[in-house]
């Protein structure tokens, strides 16, 4: 979960988010090296009086600044493509949950269970209890089993929405008339907060998402009480 004045990412709680954090560090290091090289060259230009006014052709230099950027782009593209394929890969999910976006709340349907559906609204500020998080608490949490692949089917009944949970590396658009999917695997139990990440109207800021990841036994007990 995020905290005040946070500058970095939230702690990763899924394999996908772990990969995204590694890719971020990898790319940031490349950007740092390029920036350092550019600043070094600029400092040399400003502090020395060496000039090459008579130079008309420099094949070696042109070759270097053509090949080197191509290599850098390959070093960025390959791990990026790998993560994209990992995010799209779904192998025999144990549970499927259908998520529908509305103005301005979410509804959930556990397709593996009969009549296990509910709406999830934000709890107003005046109704919060001590310890609750303002603008992020909901009346019905999405309870899911941890360490088990879960397929999320995401769509919308009105306008564009986006179902996003940062600590799990999830952000999938909810588009009317189209069903998108995402894979969710949590490596630890806990509460994970998210929000609608697509401007969808006047109450866009009041569409929080709360996932409660629990051991499988607790999930089975929860489904029994809900049915």
Swiss-Prot record:
Per UniProt, where does Cu cation A1 bind? 161, 196, 200, 207
Record bears the keyword Iron-sulfur: no
Q: What is its EC number?
A: 7.1.1.9
Where located?
Mitochondrion inner membrane
- Family membership: Belongs to the cytochrome c oxidase subunit 2 family.
Subunit-structure text: Component of the cytochrome c oxidase (complex IV, CIV), a multisubunit enzyme composed of 14 subunits. The complex is composed of a catalytic core of 3 subunits MT-CO1, MT-CO2 and MT-CO3, encoded in the mitochondrial DNA, and 11 supernumerary subunits COX4I, COX5A, COX5B, COX6A, COX6B, COX6C, COX7A, COX7B, COX7C, COX8 and NDUFA4, which are encoded in the nuclear genome.
- Provide the protein name: Cytochrome c oxidase subunit 2
Q: Which organism is it from?
A: Tupaia glis (Common tree shrew)
Lineage, highest ranks first: Eukaryota, Metazoa, Chordata, Craniata, Vertebrata
